[in-house]
């Protein structure tokens, strides 16, 4: 006979949700920082400028 599973407690649910939101906030902060870096032109570590490529054009 089928038996229903135990209900997850509100505390456990809230812990998981808080962890997920924290991780999402960190990723959003990284993305914003990366975007700012690209816009200000300080993004040499992201898109290294190859000197030879610029000369060919």
Curated annotation (Swiss-Prot):
Pfam families: Ribosomal_L32p
Region of interest called Disordered, as start-end residue ranges on this chain: 1-21
Any one of the GO BP annotations: translation
MF annotations from Gene Ontology: structural constituent of ribosome
Keyword terms: Ribonucleoprotein, Ribosomal protein
UniProt feature, compositional bias: Basic residues: 1-20
Entry-linked SUPFAM superfamilies: Zn-binding ribosomal proteins
Superkingdom of the source species: Bacteria
An annotated GO cellular component: large ribosomal subunit
InterPro entries for this protein: Ribosomal_bL32 (IPR002677), Ribosomal_bL32_plant/cyanobact (IPR044958), Ribosomal_zn-bd (IPR011332)
Similarity field: Belongs to the bacterial ribosomal protein bL32 family.
Protein's recorded name: Large ribosomal subunit protein bL32
Source taxonomy: Bacteria, Bacillati, Cyanobacteriota, Cyanophyceae, Oscillatoriophycideae
Gene name as annotated: rpmF
């Amino acid at each position: 006979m089928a038996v229903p599973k135990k209900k997850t407690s509100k505390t456990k649910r809230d812990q998981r949700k808080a962890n997920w939101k924290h991780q999402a906030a960190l990723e959003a902060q990284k993305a914003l920082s990366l975007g700012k870096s690209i816009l200000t032109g300080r993004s040499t570590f992201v898109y290294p400028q190859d000197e030879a490529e610029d000369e060919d054009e």
